[in-house]
């Protein structure tokens, strides 16, 4: 009996005309393995990178298509190559770095070396040593190239396919999806930040979630309360072909009210007691002539293109086994801006250390309402990663520009966010302090955060370093700038409480 027939027996599909699907499609390991071959390696296209991420010849990025590791590289001034990230000799990982620049890829195991197009060029001891050993006489390097993949570029987005007979990328996308991508990527972009989070669910659930416009104004309190995205606005759902690709959109300026509809239903999403102390986060400007202010586009199976007002991002979905997936966020903009910063110098260790002790204790003891008081009124708070700092990405996983925004974040945590009950414990490292001539103190301290769940399960949640600016105020020392630089670029699930 074929594998398909076995799955057909194990997974009981409903009768024709019923829209519900068996829950087993999200939990069946055999189906997951089948998806890797028939779907991700089938006649489709998978997003892997933006061209701006690998601008120079030799620049590369490693990624995954399904759960298969791949490399995409700029192999010449006007072309890209991609191949499976496994040596053709023994299948070991060829490239361990996430990004970089090379003129060749050499396997560390046996030193087989490949050019930028994946062609095998050199084999260590090809002819043996001192006349002994070596490869067989009929060994040809051209027979042992890497598994090459098709690459096509559309509006600066790089897609790859395992199927060399797959239709061209633009045909795969379809006219409606292609038009929306052109709308978003009408100009060259600049990458602002890239971060990832691990989610404990089957990858298909996330792709279905972004297509589910039913939940958006019911679950997301900020969207409904502050009229960012509501059912009372003009909008809709656009499907392409068989419905695998989609766009859900709304136009904020067309809101007809509708608050009574939410209130009469007793829905949590409409919360008139939820107010912002700093509403700059809601301010936006018309960036597109069509008036669309909220658009989520899903390109099946692994890409989401986001426009939430002026917040633009790509989301890359990577399966991590049948019960997990990783979501990579790539934020971008199409004009270059950078804010200058001023750093200081000199020692104030004996005064600064108690500030950090009190800061960590405030979070660990869940006194979250007091957390914003550690900051100046005009301040900068950011959670980012070492990888993002290395690449000079200006935005973070979390970012606030005033004490008001910090207060709003705590209110959101209490009123809008839904998450499993958990507690945290900070472990603080060595403190390094110096002050500038204008009185601004620059401080740096390592930290680790342990997370304790309701079940009692205890785990290392985050580790990193704070890079801060501290100033003297009438109330004492306060943070003017606090940047938490995380060691890992992948966060387990999400960050809710302060770091």
Q: What residue spans do the PLM features occupy?
A:
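A beta-strand edge to alpha-helix "cap/lid" segment located at domain peripheries
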Residues: 432-499
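Short, contiguous pre-domain boundary segments
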Residues: 8-23
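Non-catalytic accessory segments flanking enzyme active sites
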Residues: 19-21, 25-65, 70-71
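Rieske [2Fe-2S] iron-sulfur-binding domain
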Residues: 54-164, 171, 175
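C-terminal catalytic domain of Rieske-type non-heme iron oxygenases
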Residues: 149-342, 346
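Generic beta-strand structural signal
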Residues: 64, 74, 114, 152-153, ...
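Short, low-complexity N-terminal intrinsically disordered segments enriched in polar/charged residues
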Residues: 343-365, 373-377
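A solvent-exposed, acidic/Ser-Thr-rich amphipathic alpha-helical stretch
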Residues: 377-446
């Amino acid at each position: 009996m074929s594998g398909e027939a076995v799955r057909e027996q194990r997974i009981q599909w409903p009768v024709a005309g019923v829209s519900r699907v068996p829950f087993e499609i999200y939990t069946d390991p055999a189906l997951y393995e089948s998806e890797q071959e028939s779907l991700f390696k089938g006649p489709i296209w998978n997003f892997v990178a933006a061209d701006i991420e690998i601008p120079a010849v030799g620049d590369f990025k490693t990624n995954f298509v399904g759960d298969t590791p791949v490399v995409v590289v700029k192999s010449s001034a006007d072309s890209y190559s991609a191949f499976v990230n496994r040596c053709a000799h023994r299948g070991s990982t060829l490239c361990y770095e996430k990004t970089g620049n090379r003129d060749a890829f050499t396997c560390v195991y046996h030193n087989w070396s490949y050019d930028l197009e994946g062609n095998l060029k050199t084999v260590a001891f090809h002819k043996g040593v001192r006349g002994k050993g070596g490869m067989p006489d009929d060994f040809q390097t051209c027979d042992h190239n890497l598994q090459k993949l098709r690459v096509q570029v559309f509006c600066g987005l790089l897609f790859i396919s395992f199927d060399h007979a797959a239709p061209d990328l633009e045909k795969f996308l379809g006219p409606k999806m292609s038009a929306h991508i052109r709308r978003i990527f009408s100009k060259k972009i600049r990458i602002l930040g890239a971060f990832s989070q691990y989610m404990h669910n089957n990858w298909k659930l996330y792709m279905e979630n972004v297509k589910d416009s039913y939940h958006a104004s019911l679950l997301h309190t900020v969207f409904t309360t502050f009229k960012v995205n509501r059912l009372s606005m003009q909008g809709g759902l656009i499907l392409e072909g068989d419905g695998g690709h989609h766009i859900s959109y709304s136009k904020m300026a067309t809101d007809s009210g509708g608050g009574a509809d939410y209130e009469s239903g007793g829905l949590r999403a409409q919360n008139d007691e939820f107010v912002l102390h700093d509403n700059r986060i809601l301010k936006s400007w018309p960036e597109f002539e069509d008036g669309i202010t909220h658009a989520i586009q899903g390109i099946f199976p692994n890409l989401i293109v986001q426009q939430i007002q002026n917040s633009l991002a790509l989301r890359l979905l990577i399966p991590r086994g049948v019960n997990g997936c990783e979501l990579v966020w790539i934020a971008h903009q199409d004009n270059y801006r950078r804010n200058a910063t001023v750093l200081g110098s000199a020692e104030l260790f004996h005064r600064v250390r108690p500030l950090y002790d009190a800061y960590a204790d405030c979070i660990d003891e869940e006194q979250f309402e007091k957390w914003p008081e550690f900051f100046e009124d005009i301040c900068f708070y950011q959670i980012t990663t070492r990888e993002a700092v290395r690449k000079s990405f200006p935005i973070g996983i979390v970012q606030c520009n005033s004490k008001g925004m910090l207060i709003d974040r705590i209110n959101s945590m209490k009123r809008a966010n839904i998450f499993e009950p958990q507690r945290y414990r900070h472990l603080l490292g060595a403190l390094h302090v110096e002050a500038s001539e204008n009185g601004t103190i620059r401080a740096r301290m390592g930290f680790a955060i342990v997370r304790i769940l309701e079940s009692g399960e205890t785990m290392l949640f985050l580790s990193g370093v704070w890079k801060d600016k501290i100033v003297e105020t009438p109330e004492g020392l306060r943070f003017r700038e606090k940047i938490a630089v995380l060691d890992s670029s992948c966060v387990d699930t999400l960050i809710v409480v302060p770091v």
